[in-house]
UniProtKB/Swiss-Prot annotation:
Gene, per the UniProt record: thrB
NCBIfam families associated with the record: thrB
Pfam family membership, one: GHMP_kinases_C
Cystine pairings recorded for this chain: none
Species, as recorded: Streptococcus uberis (strain ATCC BAA-854 / 0140J)
Pathway(s) the chain acts in: Amino-acid biosynthesis; L-threonine biosynthesis; L-threonine from L-aspartate: step 4/5
Name of the protein: Homoserine kinase
């Protein structure tokens, strides 16, 4: 059995802590033989290989009595880069418990559990459902809308350095004025409406006009300004920080992607530039 979970890119500018897309990088968990103790085989640095691994901790939270197994973990989702690496592990852990303990959890229940563990829905929602997901968590009320993402190409610049979510959150202001909040909300409303309508020109402008977080976080990613400037000049719809950063995501017309890719490659930035696509399936279990 293989559990497959996509990477995710959250916020999309003004959709702070509530909007995300699933993209084509993956965590795969292969469940092998039973053992006396848990063994998670992987090649990641500073990640536990025993029951302290987040995958196993999540599974045991739901089903404490499941039998230990040899688990093979494969992932091309980089850690601490704003692509939902921890969310993918949490979602995989929930599915691991669901399969081994035969819990028969609905997708909505998996989403609720993942949101409770993660603390916010913006990454776990697209990791589970795929595509574009807009979600809201207010007290005990959790709602979401899944929608197809408009036609666009994606480029991701993944820096060779980490940016911890805690550091990125520390850069945010403690309060927004009422006037600022109204303006930020109107921008977010337009961004979502344009995405649902398939109007990437208007969506792109709204994404880049975010007032909730990018103004304060851009300085933490030294490449952001030059990437945004070149991408816009070359015809991109929008450039935004993926999640808490430092990954920078570019949305562009299909016919512009190769030109933008080459322009950014010529900058010789310290990181990896990748072409990505929207993942449409979300969480998968392969037998």
């Amino acid at each position: 059995m293989i559990i497959k979970v996509p990477a995710t890119s959250a916020n999309l500018g003004p959709g702070f802590d509530s909007v995300g897309i699933a993209v084509t990088k993956y965590l795969e968990i292969e469940v092998l033989e039973e053992r006396d103790d848990w063994y998670v085989e992987h090649t990641l640095e500073n990640v536990p290989s025993d029951h302290h691994n987040l995958l196993i901790q999540t599974a045991l939270r739901l089903a404490p009595d499941i039998k230990p197994h040899h688990i093979l973990m494969r992932s091309d989702i980089p850690l601490a880069r704003g692509l939902g690496s921890s969310s993918s592990v949490i979602v995989a852990g929930i599915e691991l418990a669901n399969q081994l303990a035969k819990l028969e959890l609905s997708m909505d229940r998996k989403f609720a559990i993942a949101t409770e563990i993660e603390g916010h829905p913006d990454n776990v929602a697209p990791a589970i459902f795929g595509q574009l997901v807009i979600a809201s968590q207010l007290d005990n009320q959790l709602d979401y809308i899944r929608a197809p993402f408009p036609e666009a190409s994606l480029l991701a610049f993944i820096p060779n350095y980490e940016l911890k979510t805690s550091d990125s959150r520390d850069a945010l202001p403690k309060h927004l004025s009422y006037k600022q909040a109204v303006a930020a909300s109107s921008i977010a409303n337009l961004a979502i409406a344009a995405l649902l309508k398939g109007d990437m020109e208007k969506a792109g402008r709204a994404i880049e006009n975010d007032l909730f977080h990018e103004l304060y976080r851009q300085r933490l990613v030294k490449e952001f300004h030059s990437i945004k400037q070149i991408s816009k000049k070359s015809g991109a719809y929008a450039t935004y920080l993926s999640g808490a950063g430092p990954t920078v995501m570019i949305l562009c017309p299909h016919e512009k992607v190769e030109g933008i890719f080459q322009e950014l490659t010529d900058l010789s930035l310290d990181g990896l530039l990748e072409r990505l696509q929207i993942d449409e399936k979300g969480l998968q279990v392969l037998f």
